[in-house]
Structures are given as C-alpha cells and as structure tokens.
Amino acid sequence: MKVFPIFGRRSRSAAPIPARGAGRHAAPAFDDSADDQASYDDTEAWTHETYDGDADGAAYAEPAPEGSLGAHGLAKTYGGRTVVRDVSLNVRRGEAVGLLGPNGAGKTTVFYMITGLVKADAGRIELDGHDVTHLPMYRRARLGIGYLPQEASIFRGLSVEDNIRAVLEMVEPDRRQRQRDLDSLLEEFHVTRVRKSPAIALSGGERRRVEIARALASRPTFMLLDEPFAGIDPIAVGDIQALVRQLTERGIGVLITDHNVRETLGLIDRAYIIHTGSVLMEGKPDAIVASPDVRRLYLGEEFRL
C-alpha cells in the first residue's frame, strides 16, 4: 500500500494554525473549502468530548496524562481471524518506544491503528488524554501526530529546500519566519549543502534526513516511524539513530516499528514485544533481551546487543 506523507502540526493545541493575528477559532489559512472547515470544526470539538465506554457499555480506564500518546485494549479481526487482541501501550513526550515482534505477530496492525491507517474493531486511542480513536489520519496529524512511512515520501520533483518550504507555507504565515525556520532545519539536519539539489538525487541517508526535517516543519508532538532503517546502508544506521535522538531531545515522543531489531533496541528507551496479537512484554532494552520468553519466541538464544 502506497501511503503519502501525513504531517503533524505546529502546536499542541487542538486547532489548526490560524493566520497570525487571528483568534483561536478563526479558520486556518490553508483550509479553503467548506468541507475542510467542517472537518476543522469537528477537530476543534474533540477537546470538549467525553467518552464513557464502548457500545456495550464497557468503561475504559482514566485518560492518559497530558504529554502522552496511548492505546488501550486495541483489537482487530480479519475474516474471522483475530490478529490483535487487547493491546495497550503508551508513549510519553521525549522518549523513544519500540513496537517489535516476529512477522505476523500483529505489530504492524497495531501501529497502523495508532496512525489511523487501520480502523480498530475495539479499544481506544488517546492523545494527551483525549479520545482520537475515530478521527481519520489527517485530523490526527493536525493534532500533533506525525507519521513517516516506510516508502520514500519525499517530493522528488522539488529541491530539498522546497520540500521543507512546502510544509512551512501551510503552518507559518510570516514569510521571514518561514525562511528562518527553513534555514534552521536545513542546518540542524545537515542538509544545507544540498538545499538546491533535486530530491531525487539524494542518498538514502540524506533522503531520510530531509523527510524528518520536513515532518518537523509542522511541529508535531509525536512521530510514528515505520521501518526507519529500511533501505538504509549500514554506514547510515548511526545517522538515523542520531536523528531519532534529535527528535526526543526536542521533546517529541517517538514510536518506532522496524524489523531491524538490534538497531532499534540500540536507540529506544522502552519496547513493547507483540506476539500472536498480544503484548508479550514491555520494558527497557536490557530487560527485553534478558527475558527467556522473548529470547525463546522472538530474538533467539544467541541474540546480543
């Protein structure tokens, strides 16, 4: 499935960014249609909604605290086969969390339910304690959930700087501030020297840096990284790990799913191991690697960090 990039948004408030000088409830500058305005109004209302339980009256636990992205009791069934059952996890701002497990375990389905690409059959997804379970992907993005797909998502027909500028133009109305933000992102992610280069000419590592810089142009509070090490040369692995650390140093919460277990465990603070559709274990990398069950069912007895 080809997925185009969905970006986060400028701040942690519920509304898209209005033009400078406008009130909080003014229509955002980049929403021109009535359909977009209706979507915006719906998104504005989410902070005032409450959720008392599912359709059967089952109550959920108290909402997660502000500064967190959480999933509670997620379940998914395809054709009578349950692939995810009662999965709960939490990511706090400023930490990197791995979502790992063997092929077919259900981790990708869990990840896609959190991004909004797959609809959950049961359970609840919360951002800063508010229910976003039924919001589509683009509205979650407006609220601060950024997503970087596995596939190359860069705009290949644009230069490096125009890739980033395209997002800044949606969220920053002041031209001079946009230029300052652009220069800052180019410098921070070490792509200033290729700013005029066509995106199609970038190496794998350069492309990832530009994609992350472009995603950050909208100031997300959480980033969901789908296979960030896919298609990356071994020499660039450390580069990607450093980029993830830059995100957490900015106070951004990061959720990573990847088949490159060693590289992922080398940069995250915690991990959830999914096995046969459920959470087998949650813990720090050292505890994960030391777990007899995780080694027997997933890592193998000879695995070492």
Predicted segments — roles?
Residues 198-202, 206:
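Conserved ABC ATPase signature
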